């Protein structure tokens, strides 16, 4: 069995379809962990197209609670059961889709993981003005926080993984360009920060911020899909980071031992190279150690490239 983990989907499941179609043969014992804002309970409907898409997968989905979705215990079709050692919410019609209960600890081949869902919606005022769904209990309340803290105390503040939607303040990406940045409620992040200072953990996985960032002991995931506990990407399907005409520095050759710089000539669309883990680029450039005429370097993967400011 295998365990994969990725960030927000917002009902766009192309990255999961690519994973199953091109990169991994998924089985009924495999699990994909989705770190909130999955897009299944956004309207609170008990039957919708998105659930049926995921129900067609052979594997399990463990969904962490996001801020843009109704909590399962408010929806009549959900039941509870014990799954991988912890309590989850599920619908009998879609048994392979389970929602983690905040504060529950789950077992993944001997590795323990705790789930902590919820976050503040930075667009809360806009949603209230326009009538878009907004959920008053989007952030963990005092009861949830106590449950999380008690569970962690039961394991002597030692856990392998944390699965959350938002993150401790120390890992929070800067968002000063966001309108009304100073009005964002950071109480959940501050609470998580106090937990992180005391907790002995291997990796803290989170989503919410729509980016992919690797920290020493934490990972922010969005388009990127990783195997649980592993540093390398299984797949990264999403926005190309670089554009045609942009100047970049890149590595190439055996073990990426050679360096070059040049201009992006072509972006290989996702699906053009379906067997690849992430987007790649054709670059017209020059090797750093042997300046001369420009050469076309084909299919340079995104992780080998850096922008030249």
Where are these regions (language model features)?
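Short beta-strand-centered aromatic/proline hotspots
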Residues: 258-270
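Core catalytic region of metal-dependent phosphoesterases/phosphodiesterases
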Residues: 2, 6, 11-108, 181-182, ...
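Mixed-charge, Lys/Arg-rich low-complexity intrinsically disordered regions
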Residues: 235-248
């Amino acid at each position: 069995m295998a365990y994969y983990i990725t960030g927000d989907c917002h009902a766009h499941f192309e990255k999961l379809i690519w994973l199953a179609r091109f990169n991994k043969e998924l089985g009924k014992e495999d699990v994909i962990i989705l770190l909130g804002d999955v897009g299944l309970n956004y309207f609170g409907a008990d039957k919708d197209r998105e659930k049926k898409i995921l129900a067609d997968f052979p594997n399990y989905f463990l969904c962490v609670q996001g801020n843009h979705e109704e909590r399962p215990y408010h929806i009549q079709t959900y039941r509870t059961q014990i799954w991988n050692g912890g309590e989850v919410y599920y619908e009998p019609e879609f048994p392979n889709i389970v929602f983690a209960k905040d504060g529950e600890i789950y077992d993944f081949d001997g590795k323990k993981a705790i789930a902590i869902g919820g976050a503040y919606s930075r667009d809360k005022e806009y949603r209230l003005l326009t009538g878009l769904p907004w959920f008053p209990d989007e952030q963990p309340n005092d009861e949830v926080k106590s449950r999380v803290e008690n569970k962690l105390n039961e394991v002597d503040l030692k856990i392998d993984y944390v699965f959350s939607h938002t993150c401790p303040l120390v890992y929070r990406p800067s968002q000063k360009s966001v309108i009304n940045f100073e009005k964002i409620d950071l109480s959940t992040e501050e609470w998580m920060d106090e937990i992180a200072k005391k907790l002995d953990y291997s990796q803290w996985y989170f989503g919410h911020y729509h980016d992919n960032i690797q920290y020493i002991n934490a990972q922010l995931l969005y388009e990127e899909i990783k195997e649980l506990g592993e540093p390398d990407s299984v797949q990264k399907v999403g926005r190309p980071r670089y554009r045609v005409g942009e100047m970049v520095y890149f590595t190439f050759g055996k073990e990426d031992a050679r360096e070059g710089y040049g201009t992006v000539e072509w972006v290989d669309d996702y699906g053009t190279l379906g067997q690849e883990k992430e987007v790649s680029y054709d670059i017209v450039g020059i090797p750093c150690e042997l300046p001369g005429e420009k050469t076309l370097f084909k299919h340079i993967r995104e992780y080998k490239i850096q922008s030249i400011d």
